[in-house]
Amino acid sequence: MVPVYLAAMPGSPAPDAAGPPALAVVGAAVFDGGGGPPLPGRTVVAAGGVIERVGPVGRTVPPAGAVVVDGAGATLLPGFVDAHVHLDCYPPAQVLAGGVTTVRDLGWPAERLAALGARAAAPGAASPRLLAAGQIVTVPGGYPTRAPWAPPGTARPVDGPAEAAAAVAELAEAGAAVIKVALDDRVGPTLPAPVLAAIVEAAVERGLGVTAHVGTAAEAAKALAVGVGELAHWPFDPRPLPDPLVDALAEAVVAVPTLHIDPSPARRAGVRRFVARGGRVVYGTDLGNQGPPPAVDTEELRLLVEAGLPPAQALAAATSLAAAHLGLAGTGRVVAGARADLLLVDGDPLADLAALSRVRLVTRDGWVAANSGRQGGATPPVP
């Protein structure tokens, strides 16, 4: 019996009459996740776990009985989407309370992910929404079979194309949202190109993408050649990647840079070149590794801005763009009809990323996960 850690990809949001009570955030500036400037003086109303209305304070009245939260002096954003975590390294409730409402786990034992997934799927769960890759596909003796951070069962060694395709089928049956492969020639053998190609083919047959942990430029080129569509990190190669490779990566892959865990000059410059060539970037932190906090990682965002993303685009990479990349319809926006995944912070994060650490309110599907106490109480019924 294969442990199932994600029963199904969450579909488009729909109001749940038995869900959380109506909620209204009044008077906040709203960054809606689309990459534009915040809209000042807005009221956002959510009911049944879905955003119902977003409008100017004077023309948007909270419904009777709604819990009203004071948004004065604050910015309301979509809850963050972290595309690279190892969730079991921290209490999920702590991650959620820090403003991260959706995560994608990129490598952990199936049995432990099954327990995390069951908790995350419960209504009102004190956990981010969880998508997962499951085990990391590698070769015998390859990364991360001997990595000190990886519990037994994190790696899925395969020997040959047939065994690789069977591993993909098993991971897909368990509910994998993506297939992760390890190509780290700095620490051991790596998947040969024919085996890697078999993994990509088997994943595509099941509607899944492939993300790669790559150590060097050579492994990035190998991944690119067989159709891997995502880098789970920017390569750790201390040498600059050749220009033709950066050009090709910018054309063909999405990068989850994870710069905070290793902000070496070569990696920072590489992401800067990738962005300058129009490469697509999605926010991910490698939570569980050294550096990233169990919350919004403002240092990762700062490094993305340093790499050339305007602040609004960096925030979009952590909200709407990340959600779209993960296939989550109706997530990562503060607009009518979207999931009520909300993050209210003191100040303006576009002017000062540190504002993202000053959390006033977090909701996931409309359920309150963190509240600093600036609450106006329930709106009285209209006579």
What are these regions (language model features)?
Residues 1-63, 347-352, 367-368:
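N-terminal metal-binding scaffold of metallo-dependent hydrolase/deaminase domains
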Residues 267-348:
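His/Asp/Glu-enriched, well-ordered alpha-helical/loop segment
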Residues 28, 44, 49, 73, ...:
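Divalent metal-coordination and catalytic microenvironments
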Residues 86, 108-109, 135-137, 184-186, ...:
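Active-site beta-loop-alpha junctions enriched in small/polar residues
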Residues 318, 336-380:
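C-terminal cap of metal-dependent C-N hydrolases
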Residues 224-231, 250-254, 278-280:
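Glycine-enriched alpha-helix->loop->beta-strand junction motifs that scaffold or abut catalytic
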Residues 74-76, 92-184, 188-208, 244-245, ...:
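Divalent-metal coordination cores built from histidine and acidic residues
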